């Protein structure tokens, strides 16, 4: 396996040839980022700050979950127990995906640019009809250093120039729509529609 290091100003992003997959394990007894198989995966904490590179809406089967809506999220951690400056991918469903979608909608309504934010993903415990589970709550903040700003710029370059898609994990899924860009064209934010 080869690894590429993408450099932009002060930011360095490690890009593995094979997608570096992280599971958002929302099972009642776990509630953490997990690397590796569910039964022997390495737990990597309940929160991380990250830069989102790209999101893709999917529908289908993943693991034991059948015919669900999924959000494939490509990101670069900037703090927490996940390896920093490494391009990773995870898949969100139900409440965790809805929480990120709701935040994205609020950004659009307020005329903000998601590409200029560092996000915090935090597991929070919930009670459901079938017992307790965890969901990922999303918040955001402005970049706090030049390196974080450079990392946001690097994420935009990667989004526009790399064909990011985890085909192996999503072989039992179909694309719901074109990739979801994390910001609207400037003309759309002023009320005009643009065609792609």
Identify what each model region corresponds to:
Residues 155-163:
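Acidic, low-complexity/disordered segments
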Residues 100-120:
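Short nucleic-acid-contacting surface segments enriched for D/E, G, S/T with interspersed K/R
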Residues 45-47, 90-94, 108-111:
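N-terminal start-of-chain detector that recognizes signal peptides
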Residues 74-105:
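Short acidic, glycine/tyrosine-flanked loop/strand segments centered on an H-E-D-like triad
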Residues 40, 55, 97-100, 111:
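Generic N-terminal initiation segments characterized by hydrophobic and/or small/turn-forming residues
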Residues 1-83, 128-129, 141-145, 149-150, ...:
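OB-fold ssDNA-binding interfaces and closely related basic DNA-contact patches used
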Residues 168-172, 176-179:
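Long, charge-rich alpha-helical interaction segments
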Residues 117-156:
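OB-fold/S1-family single-stranded nucleic acid-binding modules
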């Amino acid at each position: 396996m080869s690894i590429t290091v993408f450099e932009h100003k002060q930011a360095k992003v490690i890009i593995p040839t094979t997608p570096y997959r992280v599971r958002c394990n929302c099972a009642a007894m776990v509630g953490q980022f997990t690397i590796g198989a569910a039964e022997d995966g390495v737990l990597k904490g309940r929160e991380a700050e990250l830069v989102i590179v790209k999101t893709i809406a999917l529908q289908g089967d993943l693991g034991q979950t059948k015919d669900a809506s999924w959000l494939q999220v490509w990101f670069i951690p900037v703090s927490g127990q996940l390896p920093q400056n490494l391009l990773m991918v995870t898949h969100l469903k139900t409440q965790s995906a809805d929480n990120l979608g709701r935040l994205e909608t609020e950004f659009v309504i307020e005329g903000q640019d998601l590409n200029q934010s560092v996000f915090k993903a935090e597991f929070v415990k919930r009670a459901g009809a079938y017992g307790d589970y965890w969901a990922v709550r999303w918040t955001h903040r402005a970049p706090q250093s030049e390196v974080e700003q450079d990392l946001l710029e690097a994420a935009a370059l990667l989004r526009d120039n790399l064909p990011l898609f985890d085909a192996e994990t999503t072989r039992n899924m179909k694309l719901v729509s074109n990739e979801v860009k994390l910001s609207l064209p400037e003309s759309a934010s002023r009320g005009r529609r643009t065609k792609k």
